[in-house]
Structure formats: C-alpha cells, structure tokens
C-alpha cells in the first residue's frame, strides 16, 4: 500500500523497476502537458521506490472534467516517436497494474495493439476457446484495416482511479505511458465509469462516433483484467470483441 505524508505519496511496487518506469512515464507526460499540474509531480525515484507530490483534496465537477478533457487532448497532441515507444530514458517494459507489458516501437498501430497489448493477455487469460477465437477474429479485423492515426503521448492506464480531481483540477497518476492511439485513454476512462465522462469527452473534442470505437480500445484492459482479476471479466471481453467486429463491419 502507498505510504502518505502530508505532502507526498511513497510507493514501493512489487515488480522490480516498476517504480522507475512509472517515474519516467510521469516525467514524459509532464513534459508534453500544456499544464504540468495535470500530471502528478515526481519528487524522487529509484528502481524500487517512487515518491510523488500528494494531490490536494478536491471534488470532480463538470467544468473540471471539461478542462481535464482539454488537457488530455493537448497532451496527446504532443506526440510520440512511435507506437509502443517507452518514455525517453526508459528501455524496459511498463506495467499496467501488476502486469508487465512489452514496449517495442513500431510504425503500425494495429500491429502494436494486437501483438503487444491484446493477444499477449487474452492468450494467457482463462477464457474459453470460443471466447479466445472471437478475440482473435477481432484482432484480425483490426490488423486488416488501414488506420489513419499518428502516435500520441498517452497515459496508457487511465481508468477513473488514475485521474484524480484535486483542488487544482484533474491530475493524472500511475501511468503505463507509451506512444499509442489517443482514443485508448478515452476507452479506459469509459471502462469503469469516470465521473463526468460526457464532459471529459466534450472538453477533449472526441469524435461523434467515439462510442462505436470504445469497445475496440477496451480489448486490452479487459484482457488484462481477465488474466489478473479472473473470470468476471471474460464476458465483458467477449462483448467487446463482438462489438469490435461489428464496428469494423
């Protein structure tokens, strides 16, 4: 469990080097942010421990959510060198929850997403053969399509618990930062019901058809949860795969 003082939060992750990966991710995100206060400040970090500035207490609001959406869009626009690229100064994998994941730069988003994010977790999760076949068919459909998207600088694990609303507005914590599709962060926010989600999307300027594509961007976190949290995520993963196939025609 994180240790909290009046001004800081100290974490010692179980995974070796996870603290360093998180610290480099936070610094990279802060460098790309329009307002550095949108990203938790790293006070100090080592291979085993990370200390961040504690987020001052606050409550979400519609206006704060719209501002957070705008800041997220600006962060994404700051870009990344490639899909899957880790933050500068970090060559290793990153971590989503307790799960380690590959970060090998590639020019093709679909290849990166399918081969480094969805299938590695889906194939290890305890889902049925029929469910795995459905996920693989969804991945084949993703890979078969040409995607007009440039690498964005993304948080990579932006569920509601990693977008805090303090007294100064929205603040992101605990990233799995890498170069990715910008809507990946939107899909994660939608997965577990972020407060004022509609306002976040409004501030972000999300496309009108974003709901159609949300399930595709949830394949990765649902596959991770099916592996790390068990069978309660099997059906949601199955539904997301089916919705992805429907969206891709």
Regions found by a protein language model. Name each.
Residues 21, 39-43, 71-93, 115, ...:
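Structured catalytic cores of enzymes that bind and process phosphorylated ligands/cofactors
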Residues 80-153:
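An alpha-helical support segment within catalytic cores of ATP-dependent transferases
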Residues 3-111:
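ATP-binding pocket architecture of kinase catalytic cores
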Residues 47, 167-169, 219:
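Short strand-connecting beta-turns/loops that link adjacent beta-strands
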Residues 24, 36-41, 123-140, 178-179, ...:
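A conserved long alpha-helix in the C-terminal portion of kinase-like catalytic domains
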Residues 1-7, 246-249:
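Short, low-complexity, intrinsically disordered N-terminal peptides in bacterial proteins
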Residues 102-114, 149-153, 160-215:
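Active-site Asp-x-Gly
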Residues 28, 74, 112, 120-123, ...:
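Residue-level signal for well-ordered alpha-helical scaffold segments within enzymatic catalytic domains
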């Amino acid at each position: 469990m994180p240790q909290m003082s009046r001004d800081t939060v100290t974490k010692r992750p179980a995974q070796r080097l996870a603290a360093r990966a998180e610290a480099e991710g936070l610094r990279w995100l802060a460098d790309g942010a329009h307002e550095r206060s949108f990203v938790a400040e790293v006070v100090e970090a080592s291979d085993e421990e990370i200390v961040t500035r504690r987020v001052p207490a606050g409550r979400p609001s519609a206006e704060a959510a719209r501002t957070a959406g705008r800041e997220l869009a600006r962060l994404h626009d700051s870009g990344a060198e490639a899909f899957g690229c880790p933050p500068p100064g970090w060559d290793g994998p990153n971590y989503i929850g307790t799960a380690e994941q590959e970060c090998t730069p590639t020019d093709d988003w679909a290849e990166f997403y399918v081969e480094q994010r969805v299938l590695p977790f889906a194939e290890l999760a305890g889902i049925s053969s029929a469910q795995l076949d459905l996920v693989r068919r969804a991945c084949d459909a993703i890979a078969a399509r040409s995607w007009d998207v440039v690498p964005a600088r993304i948080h990579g694990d932006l569920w509601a618990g990693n977008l805090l609303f303090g007294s100064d507005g929205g603040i992101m914590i605990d990233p799995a930062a890498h170069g990715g599709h910008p809507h990946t962060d939107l899909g994660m926010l939608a997965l577990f019901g972020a407060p004022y989600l509609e306002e976040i999307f409004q501030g972000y300027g999300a496309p009108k058809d974003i709901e159609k594509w949300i399930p595709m961007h949830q394949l990765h976190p649902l596959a991770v949860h099916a592996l790390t949290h068990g069978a309660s995520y099997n059906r949601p993963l199955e539904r997301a795969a089916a919705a992805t196939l429907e969206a891709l025609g």
